[in-house]
Amino acid sequence: MARKTPLERYRNIGISAHIDAGKTTTTERILFYTGVNHKIGEVHDGAATMDWMEQEQERGITITSAATTCFWKGMDMSFPEHRINIIDTPGHVDFTIEVERSMRVLDGACMVYCAVGGVQPQSETVWRQANKYRVPRLAFVNKMDRTGANFFKVVDQMKLRLKANPVPIVIPIGAEEHFTGVVDLRKMKAIIWDEASQGMKFRFEDIPAALQASAKEWREKMVEAAAEASEELMNKYLEEGDLSEDEITSGLRARTVAGEIQPMMCGTAFKNKGVQRMLDAVIELLPSPLDVPPVPGFDEDDKAVTRRADDGEKFSALAFKLMTDPFVGQLTFVRVYSGVLAKGDTVYNPVRGKKERIGRIVQMHANERQEVDEIRAGDIAACVGLKDVTTGETLCDPTAIVTLERMVFPEPVIRQAVEPKSKADQEKMGIALSRLAAEDPSFRVSTDEESGQTIIGGMGELHLEIIVDRMRREFGVEANVGKPQVAYRETIRKTVQEAEGKFVRQSGGKGQYGHVVLKIEPNEAGKGIEFIDAIKGGVVPREYIPAVEKGVNEAVTQGVLAGYPVVDVKVTLHFGSYHDVDSNELAFKMAAIFGFKEGCKRASPVILEPMMAVEVETPEDYAGNVMGDLSSRRGMVQGMDDMVGGGKAIKAEVPLSEMFGYSTTLRSMSQGRATYTMEFKHYSEAPRNVSEAIVAARAK
């Protein structure tokens, strides 16, 4: 079966934004204009097509990135038909992992900003992730019809807060209730959308007299940005003082794909203005799978290889999302990087060393699905019936094995005990939690060895609330949830040259004998546990060294101060002894555990606590109280910015343990007018009095 849409006409894009910037409404309008859905689903009444999980419809926030396919021929039908695969990403900080996952498989992104709120905290997080995966992007300033809307202020904020290089390619005509359309700076014409047709029709007009000088000035900046794409364009621009429309487009495209500039547009998705122009820009300025570098990976021998976006290459794809569907079971969303995958094919998962047979392949339109017989390079689709694949794993042709780079997922910073309400819930809860953990790698499930309780861990209070909510809705599990617990860590501050561990049991017959001497030293922050074998002369036989490493890895799960996991320690095995008859792996493992614990006690152990980057947006009247309150929570206030629509944005770093219940305090302090976001920043040493309290609480 031949490819319906040539690969150069594919666009795999993400739509990313802060909560309430109007991202879901923007996606809805895209689906409407591309003719996929004929009734515009409004977020306000919980009917948006992309927000397909029940809680999202209630909370009005987007939680899981749904993947949708649509087609576009241009606002004035001037392009050949292009295929746009859209990944809708969440804007709430607790779901940052979803954004990270979708960034990994995108070729381009469209950042949606609110014309009133401007660049908000989550916008910065998403921007950093897009930088990490080198995703070319456009910016769309939404909600131009709202009171306080200011397009040019958002342009300045992007430069200041994101260190971006925004290049407006349209400017607004009017603002707030007088926003009527945009000036297209390439055509130097005003675009006015027809409200009766919900923006499906539009007309070109002359630029209003009051805007002509401003349009000329912004056009010059845009042409200059385009000219910098190549020497040829620059020379023409210097000689003639201008470029043709096609030259501007090709220059802007080259620089956008290279990540040097971010073309900017504006509109109001809710009032059906501007989204159509943004779709044109997606096609004109964002890359196709052929424009981005081949995806890197490793073959069986761990040699670096790449896979090109080409149907003729061997098949390779990355599983970037798992979802449980009530009707078809497990859906595994994949991005195909090379080759073709047909129903019934067998693929290989190099991470697990297993083969899997592909049952059905479906392409999603939000949560409506269409079955397809095959998918090709550049496609995004969901496979049904894969048993043993988790997020971030590679699927490839069994004859050409490749592991595409793995995604790295953060450790949870907050934990809660969860107990089923009845015996019947007990069995269902295990199944529910393991399914949810497979879908979401930033959510972890473990058992507390002392109390036997089930512990769930995640990236924030809202994250865990939604998990418990999903257990109830999707799996019918009623559960009681304990108080949130902070995920503390332990580490050391001093080096201990000789930490000796001995495990000897000799009382007639075959005994046990293991003896190790370890050097224990602090490691760089974030480096984790490093084990180095420095044994010379066989004083500890080769076959027992893995057992020593295993012992160290077991010992680090419980620190010596309060039993929290130990991080960032370098352990060197440099001496020891053995017994010809009595030595075995168990004895050396135990010796390593004893040696490590003994060494840690002498290495100035400390407790680390998670520090959160907190940003509070508040009316100016309450700024002083907010800062005082953050300081009383052991917070370090790092700065205060003016917000686009008035008010202050206060940035601070605060220990997570001090932030429980903060939303209630903030609400009462500001009469419900302040909001905040919080995300994990790093671990930091807890002050002595806090440390002592933590140790005392654990000892009870």
From Swiss-Prot:
GO terms for molecular function: GTP binding; GTPase activity; guanosine tetraphosphate binding; translation elongation factor activity. One of its GO terms (biological process) is ribosome disassembly. The keyword Cytoplasm applies. The keyword Transcription regulation does not apply. It comes from the Bacteria. Keywords: Cytoplasm, Elongation factor, GTP-binding, Nucleotide-binding, Protein biosynthesis. Residues 8-290 form the tr-type G domain. It is found in: Cytoplasm. SMART domains: EFG_C (SM00838), EFG_IV (SM00889). GO terms for cellular component: cytoplasm. Belongs to the TRAFAC class translation factor GTPase superfamily. Classic translation factor GTPase family. EF-G/EF-2 subfamily. NCBIfam families: EF-G, PRK12740.1-5, small_GTP. Catalyzes the GTP-dependent ribosomal translocation step during translation elongation. During this step, the ribosome changes from the pre-translocational (PRE) to the post-translocational (POST) state as the newly formed A-site-bound peptidyl-tRNA and P-site-bound deacylated tRNA move to the P and E sites, respectively. Catalyzes the coordinated movement of the two tRNA molecules, the mRNA and conformational changes in the ribosome. This is Elongation factor G. It comes from Verminephrobacter eiseniae (strain EF01-2). The lineage of its organism: Bacteria, Pseudomonadati, Pseudomonadota, Betaproteobacteria, Burkholderiales. The gene is fusA.
